[in-house]
Amino acid sequence: MDESGTVSPNPRKSAVSRQWGWLRGYNGGVFSEDLIAAIIVTILLVPQSLAYALLAGLPPQVGIYVSIFPLLAYAAFGSSRYLNVGPTAVISLMTAACIASLPEGTRLISAAALAVMTGAILLIAGILKAGFVMNFVSRPVVSAYITGAALLIIVSQIKHIFGITASGNTVFALLGDVRANLPNTNKVALWVGLSAIAIFWLIKKYLAYGLVKLHVKSRRAKLIGRMAPILIVVIFIGISSYFSFADKFDVRVVGRIPAGLPPFDFPMLSMPDLKGLLVPAIVISIVAFVDSTSTAQELAARSRGRIDSNKELLGLGASNIVAGITGGYPINGSMSRSAVSFSAGGQTQVVGLLVAVFMALTAVFLTPVLKALPFAVLAALIIVACFSLIDFKSLGRTWIYSRADGITALATFLAVLLLGVQWGVLAGVVLAMALHINATLQPHMPLVGRFPGTEHYRDAGRFNVETNEIVKTLRIDESLYYANARYLEDKVALVVAESPEMTDLILMCTAVNRIDASALSSLEEINKRLKSADIRLHFSDMQSRVKERLFRSNFLDRLSGQIFLSQHEAMEELGPEPDWNQLSDHVEMH
């Protein structure tokens, strides 16, 4: 209670309420739904954790390790009710690309150090409230990157389907190695792998649909379809064990998995080794954040909620650090498992807590059951999962809508396939930013005119509008800054050269959100040049905050013309009566 007698809110309770708002109103009914969702997610996660560890080039138990304590860390610091963190295909492939060239004995500790570094980068970004960095990675880049990575993942798993060895970080390197080793194909592994691909694909494609046709409720049918692969995995384990695939047919299997929870141990590497992991850690942190936040935002939108991107950075950062110190590798939010949890009725991060408990029980009691699981089955699981990540339709739509975005997406896609996953995302981000900057260097600045009998002004090069030779209006479709200020000077000079009768030039600033110091200097120079040519310079439709900044300078004191509230007001005061015969020679467009 404060001095006025009012009860002050408990700051500790307020902090808890802000971070774990989903605890308000939590009851047995919500818990039962979270429990069901957690069981279903665990059934999906057990084989996935083994498969993604295989994809990362690490022992299978590592996939289980990163599915326990990191989930607790995300629940403590993340903002999404529904996001399920853990091993994923894309991040596993990026980890594999990073550690593949390292000596066999250092890969595990290097992967753990990579997770800690990734977590530290995300954590620092969260503390600095740098969630806005997601805006620098365009959706076409993300879509193209995921499509390219999915294809690369599929190619990387061919070796397990054929039961051969192959290495490489690019499509051509992998395919070349696979081709060279095809004579060593293990026919039993090939049979197992192709059978598993066919079965998993048929289940994914048709099981839920068939159950609905048999009058099973749609939601229940979908859940059964998502849980069915674990039954297939169990069947293959039984077949492998009964026929002794490993001993009699030399089929690679998971083998003995150490039982028990992961030990807590901070990975120690030399400074040169840590420097070598820095760039991959930065790239992985970007991809992990963008991918996870996109999934979290989509699920939040479905439930009319919202997420805090800065808290997502903290949650992902904490979970990756925990993954590293428990012998794991980098993780992020899983789109598939999060969607399953949401569809199964999961409502809070209690789902993640329960999944962590179930995975811990798996690590302690169920690992002996998994030792006969063929690698070919895990590879089939990965391949079928990656089919859904390939989205050529989105790339096609992007190309049709925007050629610049299409070029960026295509370059990202090809870079992933030809250069590898790490350089692919960097190439996409850099190219997207370069094209954006290039677009602002020479912004669209058309001369505009008025639709007859209206107060609407449009591009004279595209519309049939009124124009006159006395008052010209140049519409600036971009903020003005140092990189495009000279272009504005050149554009004004061109208009002056082509308009010998002009006495007034209006700069229509509807789209101008900012004018920096360099652009202000250019405007002062333009004003001086026009004044010497007996032409007045005016502004219209200028935003208040831009106008306020101009008032701080003495530019307006020297301005030869005026600042008008609207373009129509400017033309009413400056323009002559319209000459209806003087229309721009263009077809009218609406």
Cite the ranges covered by each PLM segment:
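Transmembrane helical cores of multi-pass ion-transport proteins
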Residues: 2-455, 468, 522, 554
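Intrinsically disordered or compositionally simple regulatory linkers and C-terminal tails
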Residues: 2-13, 574-590
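Generic hydrophobic alpha-helical segments
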Residues: 95, 178, 488-492, 570, ...
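Alpha-helical elements of the RecA-like P-loop NTPase motor core of helicases
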Residues: 232, 547-548, 572
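Short linear loop/turn motifs
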Residues: 314-315, 560-571
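C-terminal structured domain segments across diverse proteins
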Residues: 327, 354, 566, 570, ...
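The feature marks cytosolic C-terminal regulatory regions of anion transporters and related permeases
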Residues: 388-553, 557-558, 568, 578, ...
